[in-house]
Swiss-Prot record:
Pathway: Protein degradation; proteasomal Pup-dependent pathway. NCBIfam families: pupylate_cterm. Residues 1-37 are annotated as: Disordered. It holds the Pfam family Pup. Transmembrane segments: none annotated. The modification Deamidated glutamine is found at residue 64. Disulfide bonds: none annotated. This is Prokaryotic ubiquitin-like protein Pup. GO terms for molecular function: proteasome binding; protein tag activity. There is a cross-link at residue 64 (Isoglutamyl lysine isopeptide (Gln-Lys) (interchain with K-? in acceptor proteins)). Residues 1-11 have a biased composition (Basic and acidic residues). InterPro entries: Ubiquitin-like_Pup. Keywords: Coiled coil, Isopeptide bond, Ubl conjugation pathway.
Length: 64
């Protein structure tokens, strides 16, 4: 049996040169990185203040 291979290309009629979409994508990546850092800082604060309670609550919810 012969297998048919299809090469997918993205975007359709768009140009390959980065433009406004590239700048918007960069801004989005920076915003996501900033939000992730803020969330990790918040988790660190909770663990520093109350690590034992955090672990106890995690185990009660089914964590291992």
């Amino acid at each position: 049996m012969a297998q048919e291979q299809t090469k997918r290309t993205g975007g359709g009629d768009e140009d390959d040169t980065p433009g406004a979409d590239g700048a918007a994508g960069q801004e989005r990546r920076e915003k996501l990185a900033e939000d992730t850092d803020d969330l990790l800082d918040e988790i660190d604060d909770v663990l520093e203040e109350n690590a034992e309670d955090f672990v106890r609550a995690y185990v009660q919810k089914g964590g291992q």
